[in-house]
Swiss-Prot record:
Cited Pfam families: ATP_bind_3 (PF01171)
Cofactor(s) essential for the protein: Mg(2+); [4Fe-4S] cluster
Protein's gene: ttcA
PANTHER family per UniProt: AMINOTRAN_5 DOMAIN-CONTAINING PROTEIN, SULFURTRANSFERASE-RELATED
Subunit structure: Homodimer.
CDD domains: TtcA-like (cd24138)
NCBIfam families assigned: PRK10696.1
Natural source organism: Syntrophotalea carbinolica (strain DSM 2380 / NBRC 103641 / GraBd1)
Function of the protein: Catalyzes the ATP-dependent 2-thiolation of cytidine in position 32 of tRNA, to form 2-thiocytidine (s(2)C32). The sulfur atoms are provided by the cysteine/cysteine desulfurase (IscS) system.
UniProt-recorded Gene Ontology molecular function terms: 4 iron, 4 sulfur cluster binding; ATP binding; metal ion binding; transferase activity; tRNA binding
Name of the molecule in the record: tRNA-cytidine(32) 2-sulfurtransferase
Amino acid sequence: MPIVEDRLFRKIKKLTGKAIGDFNLIEEGDRIAVAVSGGKDSWTLLHILDSLRRRAPIRYELIAVNVDPGFPGYRTDIMEAHLREYGFANRMERTDCATIIKEKLRPGSSFCAFCARLRRGVLYSVATELGCNKLALGHHLDDFVETLLLNQFYVGTLAAMSPKLLADNGQHTVIRPMVYVEESDVAAFAEANGLPAIPCGCPEETRSDQNRQRMKRLVSQLAEDIPHLRSSLIGALGNVQPRHLLDASLKDFGTAAAD
C-alpha cells in the first residue's frame, strides 16, 4: 500500500530535509547504501529518503542493504517482499556473523558491540562493491541523546554521535539524516504505514544494552516534567562553549586572565 503522506509524514520529512541541509549530508551524484535491518528506524529512513529523492533538486541513488547475521528465525523473506513491493533497489547480504561471534567473543566483552562491528564491516564491504560513497544509518534524535548520556555517565567523555563523518576505512561517509526526528514519531510512522517489524533473532536481544535502556527510561521520566528535554539536549550538541569546559586542549589555562 502507498505510504500515508499525512501530517506526521510531512513532519518527519521536513526534519530530515533540514538535517540534510544543515550538515550537507547528501550531494549531487551520491550513491547511498541505506542500512536496512527490518526495524522501524531503518524502514522509516528508507521511505523518507526515497520521498525526498523524488522531488530533490539534485540527483542521488538509494540502495537498501541488509546484512543477515545468521541468527535463526530472521525473516529476510518478509523484508525482501517489502522492498520489492516499493521497488527499492536492494542487496541482501547473508553472513555467518552468528558463528563468528560464538567462536571469537571474549569473556566479558559486549555481544551487541561485537556484532555491530562485524555487521558494520560487512556494510562497508558491500557499499564498496556497489560503488556507494555514502552509508545512511537510521539513528534518530533519541539515539543521539542516549549516547550523549551514556558517554558522560559510563565513559567520562562529552561526546555523542555525528550526523556525518568519514568512516574508519577512509572510503565512505556515514550519514544519520534522522538526527532531528524523535523516536516516538518514527514509531508512529511505522505503525501508521504497517511497516514490517522483523526481529533479528539475536539470542541476546532480551538482555541487550541494559545501560542504554536505563538512559532511555531516564530521558522519558525527565521529559514528563521537562517537555522540551530532548530538543534541549540535541540543541546542546550544536551549542558547545569551550570556555566553560575543563578540556585544556580547547582552552589555555596558563594565563592569569583565563576565563
